[in-house]
Amino acid sequence: MPWVGSQFHKGDAQTIMALSNVLYQVLIALGMIYVIDTSAIISRNLNLLEGDLMFPSSVIGEIKKGKLRYMIDVLLPMIRVASPDHEYLKIVEETAAKTGDLMNLSQTDKDVLALALQYDATIVTDDYSIQNVASYLNLGFLNANIKRIDKQIAWIYRCTGCKKVFPGPVKVCDICGHEVKRHYDKRKSMIRKV
């Protein structure tokens, strides 16, 4: 495809638009669903056109102008734009809270995870927090451009002074007043490869 890993040319848009309806039907027929994160679009390495591609409508809001916006406008006829059901968002938020990733996920990130959960889809992302939560939800994920995570990670929040552990993100310790930081929890993290 002319846009995979390369720059867009305005002439390519007409060709893509002409083939979009037929191509979209072929992608759906193959039965593979991919939910694309903003980082996958930014990487410009979308070579996964062997299935049904979708992303949450919030991705469009994250990419407002320039070549990437043009790329989204060209790809829109071939990509389903959807919003996840509330029940799936709730599952994602509960899981992300348990892993300690909730504060690192934007609403778009949560939407990506919830759509993948709702449609039993594979996520395409370079975001490590999304990959980590996806692994806990037993969702498949592919990296777009950078190395993917190779194990599940659980995070804890610990005071830098008195070492008190907090159940969730806190900026300042209520005991000693020191800063609370997120740390990798070796005891809760899974050894299994993802």
UniProtKB/Swiss-Prot annotation:
Residues 34-134 form the PINc domain. GO terms for molecular function: magnesium ion binding; RNA endonuclease activity. InterPro entries: NOB1, PIN-like_dom_sf, PIN_dom, Ribonuclease_PIN, VapC_family. Mg(2+) binds at D37, D150. SMART domains: PINc. The keyword Kinase does not apply. One of its GO terms (cellular component) is preribosome, small subunit precursor. It is an enzyme of class 3 (hydrolase). GO terms for biological process: maturation of SSU-rRNA. Its EC number is 3.1.-.-. Signal peptide: none annotated. It comes from the Archaea. Keywords: Hydrolase, Magnesium, Metal-binding, Nuclease, Toxin-antitoxin system. Its cofactor is Mg(2+). Belongs to the PINc/VapC protein family. HAMAP family: VapC_Nob1. Toxic component of a type II toxin-antitoxin (TA) system. An RNase. This is Ribonuclease VapC1. It comes from Thermoplasma acidophilum (strain ATCC 25905 / DSM 1728 / JCM 9062 / NBRC 15155 / AMRC-C165). The lineage of its organism: Archaea, Methanobacteriati, Thermoplasmatota, Thermoplasmata, Thermoplasmatales. The gene is vapC1.
